[in-house]
C-alpha cells in the first residue's frame, strides 16, 4: 500500500512539474516571438477585411501552402508551391495584395505556424471574432502526450479568466469557455493558448 501511495505522489509531482514546464515554455516562447506573432495577427486581420481567407501549410517543410478563399456564397480551396506564378494570379483574381500575403506566408513559415484563420463566436447573442493560429515546433513535442500543436487565440476585446488562468465565458463568468473542445489559458488579457493534438 505504501508503495502505491508513494507512486501516486510521484506521478502527481511529475504531472504538476510537467504542467508548469509547459506554461513556462509557452510564456517564454510568446515573449521571445511576440513581435512576429503580433505582426502576423495584425497583417492577417488587415487582409481578412479585404477578403475572408485562411492559410494552411500542408507539408512539414513549409513549401506547400493551401489558401481557402471565401466569397459571399462559396469557399474556394487552392494549393500552391510557395511563390509559384499561379498563386500570384489567384491572389490578384480575388483582390488580395500579393506582396502582403507573401510576407504573411513567409512570417508564418519562420515560426512554424501551420494554420491561421478567423473564427466566430457569440456573446449575448452578438457575433464576435478571434484569430486562431496553430504552431507546430520541437519545443512543443512534449513527452506523455500526443498533443503536438500550440494554439494561440487573439481576441479583439479583453477576456475573463479564473484564478488558474483558464478562459471564461464572458456571459457566465464561472463557466469555462472551450474553443474546438480545448480549454485555453491566459497569456495576456487578449491572447490565450492551449496545446492540442489537432491544428484546427
Annotate each language-model stretch with its function.
Residues 11, 37-40, 187:
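Generic hydrophobic secondary-structure signal
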Residues 4, 21-24, 88, 171, ...:
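Generic preference for well-ordered secondary structure
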Residues 14, 18, 43, 50-57, ...:
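Generic detector of ordered, mature protein regions
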Residues 84, 92-200:
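Extracytoplasmic electrostatic interaction patches
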Residues 1-30:
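Bacterial Sec-dependent N-terminal signal peptides
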Residues 20-105:
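N-terminal export/targeting and maturation segments
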